[in-house]
Amino acid sequence: MIMCEIIGRKKEIAELKRYYESGRAEFVAVYGRRRVGKTFLIDEVFHDDMVFHHTGLSPYDRRRKVTLKDQLQNFYFSLLRHGMEDIAQPKSWMEAFFLLERFLETCDNGSRQVVFIDELPWMDTARSGFLTALEAFWNGWGNMRHNLLLVVCGSATSWMLDNLINNKGGLYGRLTGEIKLSPFTLKECEEFYQSRGIRMSRYNITQAYMIMGGIPFYMNFFNPSYSLAQNIDALFFDRQAKLGDEFDRLFNSVFDHAEDCMKIVRFLGTRHAGFTRKEIAEHTGMNPNGDFTKMLKALMGSDFVVKYTPFGFSQREEYYKLIDSFCWFWLHFKEKKAVNQTDYWQQHLKEGDVASWRGIAFEEVCLQHISQIKYALHIGAVSSQESSLIVKGSEEADGMQIDLLIDRADDAVNVCEMKFYKAPYAVTKGYAQVLNSRLQALEEKNPAKTFLLTYVGNSELVSNEYSDIFRASVTLDDLFI
């Protein structure tokens, strides 16, 4: 086992090392959003000890559907590439996994055997019997091989959760380990760019995060000779943009009902606070049946969407909101505007539409760095629940929306105002009055709670006669920990 230089992932590497050194049969599932770096992590950690590595065929083929025969042939070729003797191609997954057993037995020298099967959900085509064969392979052979470490990966997170991690059939309780790989944090993004010789300020790293959400596959395309704006144009708006069809590829490779999932995401992208299940069904024209529930579950499992209960609402009033930064950017600029200008981002950086998007996108960055915000506020050890507040307006009163409240176990609530401005932020008299009225409304409705206005911004808060309305302050550097 090699320990290479990998950005971040210290906890995950330590877990993989523990499984490797356990001295018993291990069956480990690694899952997470597509492009997050699962394959890279496993390849780098186990490169010298991998006796078999296979990747399922992507279902994203515009010419025809990938069939069971295609997947079996691909698996057979992987066996041949790794040194299996040339015998008849398997006609079923039962035969295919039996061939894998025979191959592993012939090359067993007593040392740890790492078997890595990547994009496992892609291999489970309709009525293929794949899952039954996988059960037979592990239950009837693999779990008795003390030197076997089976690692499986998948970007279709809902499949991984339903069929492996929460399996109620033959694989129930058979996994010995699971690792969910998350996108990079801002700090890890900074380390990544530095390792590639890319010089960027934290202000620009944060803007890049607003667009790519800490996904290393996207960040790897950055050209060190370009500015951030030039890189964004090259990735999204150039005639041969490297991510020119990424949105379609992303959904078609992960979701069974890709078009319907895209329809849901497009609707969720129209409001940052999200919508109820009923609103989503009504506006998309979908029947809120079992398939609709599965699609929402799949979107949540793959970290595109999150479900939450707004502050002060009952548990039955749940909202679904889009949290994937790449999708937010794509829908707002690439798809909505149907841009054909190759230097679009460089030309429109200072426009109001971009400034408005930055404000919302920064809020999402903050929501993905809650632990860093809590650490900066010295409440890291306090149990809390994060949510938004949605108050619809009426003829008698104005509505109100607060995108982040940290409801703490000590009965205090941090009411976070998130601002993304290049210059230091100064509170005006008018805005101080707005904030005061919000606090009064919250206190009247929740008299047992203490509400603390908290500034979260990329720049410092200007000290003036109104700034003391904020009881605490978190700046950009605090998010880079």
Q: Predicted segment positions?
A:
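A cross-kingdom feature that marks ATP-driven nucleic-acid transaction machinery
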Residues: 311-313, 318-481
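Phosphate-binding site recognition
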Residues: 1-348, 352
